[in-house]
Amino acid sequence: MPAVASHAPIAGTIGPNAVLRLREALDADCGQDATEALFVAAGQLPLHRAPLTDMIDERAVARLHAALRSRHGLEIATRVARRAGDLTADYLLAHRIPAVARWTLPLLPSGAAARVLVRAMLAHAWTFAGSGRVAVHWATAVRRQPGEAAAIRLELVIEDCPLCRGADVDGMACEYYAATFQRLFRRLVAPTAEVREVSCIAAGGDGCRFAVSW
C-alpha cells in the first residue's frame, strides 16, 4: 500500500516559495524586465514584487509556469524552474527543516533517512501540492543493473498536479518539483541522489511521477 499525504487545511493553495523562488530564478536568468513581463502575461502582476508571506492560489502559480513555458520555451523554462526548485529546497533547509534533522539525517543509513524525509514531505504536502494528492511507492526490491550507478528506491506521485493541470507539453512540466525533491534528498539522504520526473499529466500521464534513486 502506498503512503498517502494528509489533506490540505486550505484547499487549492501553495506556499509562497513557488512564486518567490521563481521570481528570483527568472531575474537571474533573463533579467528583471523579463520577469515583470512574465507576471503581466500571466495576469499576476500583483505578485511581482509583493513580499508574499501567505499561501497563494495554486491557479496563479500554474499560470506563471504556463507563461514561462509559452514565452521562453521548454528549455529555458526547465532551466529556470530547476533553479527555482534548488532555491526552494535551500530555503526549506535553512528555515523550515529543524537543525537537528539537518544534522542527524545525513548520519543515518540512507534508507532510514529517506523514510523520515518522506514522512515529513507527506505531512506537509499541502504546502507544495495544493489540491493535488501526493503518494509514495517504495521499491519492493532494490536491484542495481550492471553499469548503472544508482537504483530506484521509491517513486513520489502527485496526482492531479496543480502546477501543470490542463497543460499540454511535449515533455515533463514539473522540473520545479523534481529539483526541489532532488536537492532535499541529496542534502539529507544521499549526496548522489537523483530525482527524475518519469511521467507527467501535461504529457498525457496518469500522474506526475518522480523516480528517486541513489
Regions picked out by a protein language model, each given a short descriptive name:
Residues 53-176, 199:
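Amphipathic interaction/junction segments at domain boundaries or subunit interfaces
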Residues 195-214:
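Beta-rich nucleic-acid/ligand-interaction surfaces
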Residues 132-136, 193-195, 213:
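Generic structural motif
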Residues 175-190:
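Active-site helix/loop of acyl-thioester processing domains in fatty-acid/polyketide metabolism
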Residues 1-91:
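N-terminal leader/assembly segments
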Residues 152, 191, 206:
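Residue-level signal for beta-strand positions within conserved beta-sheet cores that form or flank
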